[in-house]
Amino acid sequence: MLMMESDKSLVEYRQYDDTFTPKWAAETFLNEVVFEAEKTFGENTVEQLVVGAPDVWFHNFETLSGRAMVRDICNSIDTVQNVKIVSEPVLASAYFAYNFQKATGQPFDGAILIIDYGGGTLDLSLTEIRKGRNSAYEIKMLESNGAGENTDKHIGNAGIVYMETLLADLIRKELPEEEAEKLIGTSTFYAGVNELEKILKQGHKAGEIEDTFEMMGIDDLDSLEDCVLEETVQCGGEDFEISYADLVRTYNNVIRPVFDEKMDEMIQWAKKDHGIDVSKIKDGNLKIALVGGFGNFYLVREQMHEKFGFSDSDDREKGIIHNEQDRERAISYGAALIASGVFETCKTAPYSIGIRSAINGQLKTEYMIHYLEEIEMNQPYYITDDNGDNKVLCLASNWAEEFVIDYGRGNGEAIRFKAKKKFKEKLANLVKNDLKTCCFGVSFGESDILKIHIREYDCVQGEFAESDTVEEIGKFEDVFEKITR
């Protein structure tokens, strides 16, 4: 999340500087992963590198460039031949469908709701698995929502912000206000956050946290206040006790509201737009899987089970999750399945994209691609007229007041932005005819990187050129400026 962050104060708050940047951390990590893989398997090249990316990156202007940045880092590694960036929920779906076939001996044919709650983002994605061509399985994204914005120094309202807020709450509870605020946000504080995460992971692994909550419930905070974890967390030379009431209070303040909101949205959209009632069992062709490191946290699982009405006899996780480790490794194992060709992704548009132009004195949005429609990779989709023919635009005029990205939910969720002056001039200069006439389209590459297509139109001959001029949009913020309401 921080790799695309333009607010320097947010980056510095997490102890990065001009040398040790989030991008540097990503480059170092990916280089080390490739090096270790080659050393383990005795290879000197990686034919196909599949990297998972949060689907929620598509839902915010500031993170739209994330996939291009990750792809470029991977392409800079000399021994990597091909790179593919895939949504993490799609990768998890591949692994769970594979698990289902191993457990039942039958291919999975249906829908999987992936709730990916990791350290930095929350992704809820409804995917469809079907037998595809060449005996491989195809995975299609049906619906997606989530939370992942960097706001108030919080990353994605997920595991990281929970750990940070919990430790800050513990410190404020025990230390004088001035002393507490001086400690919070320091390198010592973040070392304490890491220690706290280890304690909670160990408590869940050993069953201590689950057993205690199962016995006492999560509602009586007075009783839970007297019950503490065996280990204390050290920070700034102090030992801080962690009560079960602390775990619940911070969870209710930070996680529960946004998790509830996003689950409710997914339930509504799945039923309205796809006829899938995710709150009911449907003969085994609907599965629900909670994944990501934070997905092993008891309070997260309890909230999810309550929302979807899970019972002891429920089969919506049966056959796809064999043990709790599956929740953490589903994405990485799914990447291996896609890299090896066992699963293929059915290409769907990650968002709708269009331009708003003044037509007869009124602004009108004309879309080239619509959210989640099936598309062909690298196939351009143009603005068309009422007859479905490619529409001729004049790039010498004020041809695009705004660009628009949305998710089919109306203008309330649209991201509106303007092309910067230099970029509009660059596009116009790509058209060589005097009238600057052309058709305008977009495509998505293998890693969902947006490309703009311009095909010249000869007004005298009345025909389009045989090929397009293509301009890839790597970093959105370099060529576009977000319109704030």
Which sequence ranges carry the predicted segments?
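Early-domain small/polar-rich strand-loop-helix modules and first-structured segments
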Residues: 1-12, 134, 142-160, 165-174, ...
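Phosphate-binding loop and its immediate beta->loop->alpha context
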Residues: 1-77, 162-214, 476, 480-485
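Gly/Thr-rich phosphate-binding beta-strand-loop-beta motif of the actin/hexokinase/Hsp70
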Residues: 1-3, 100-142, 335, 436-456
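Glycine-rich phosphate-binding loops at beta-strand->alpha-helix junctions
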Residues: 49-66, 280-307, 323-328
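Conserved phosphate-binding/catalytic loops in two-lobed NTP-binding clefts
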Residues: 77-91, 304-334
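Conserved phosphate-binding catalytic cores of ATP/NTP-utilizing and phosphoryl-transfer enzymes
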Residues: 83-115, 329-344
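Acidic, glycine/GT-rich loop-and beta-edge segments that sit at the periphery of enzyme/chaperone cores
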Residues: 313-430
